[in-house]
Amino acid sequence: MFLIITRDTMFFTAMKNILSKGNVVHIQNEEEIDVMLHQNAFVIIDTLMNNVFHSNFLTQIERLKPVHVIVFSPFNIKRCLGKVPVTFVPRTITIIDFVALINGSYCSVPEANVSLSRKQHQVLSCIANQMTTEDILEKLKISLKTFYCHKHNIMMILNLKRINELVRHQHIDYLV
């Protein structure tokens, strides 16, 4: 069984046509996940305008104990699902490489050029969603010094001179 987590109906239709050999289920919100029915599924997550990380959605996915998770994202997030095998792929992956990845054979999938820790991605998502510093500190339960350290590292990784340049960053749609 394949669970496709996306808000993009065109993306789901394309995945359904590519994965015609199996049972394909479209999931748009966390209430649609059935822990018993979808147990040990193969999960495909599209993060474009659908940032499921750091939410109840991700904990629901973890409870499914998926066989493998493929995430369409320009970011590589280290240990985002604990011990569940996760592969991050760009949306520009070829169909041949994607099918090879699904079948478990070797393919030359280009890795994301931006690799973040789980906490860095969480801080970045909060900043992209225009949360205030105080709200971020309260939500993530971190100190101001830790926040500034994460913010500085994120700016270095993304090549930003000022954090407000994040609004014009090419991958901002994957964070909201």
UniProtKB/Swiss-Prot annotation:
Induction: By acidic conditions. Could be induced by EvgA via the induction of YdeO. GO terms for molecular function: DNA binding. Residues 109-174 form the HTH luxR-type domain. CDD domains: LuxR_C_like. Residues 133-152 bind DNA. PROSITE patterns: HTH_LUXR_2 (PS50043). GO terms for biological process: regulation of DNA-templated transcription. InterPro entries: Sig_transdc_resp-reg_C-effctor, Tscrpt_reg_LuxR_C, WH-like_DNA-bd_sf. Keywords: DNA-binding, Transcription, Transcription regulation. May act as a transcriptional regulator of dctA. This is HTH-type transcriptional regulator DctR.
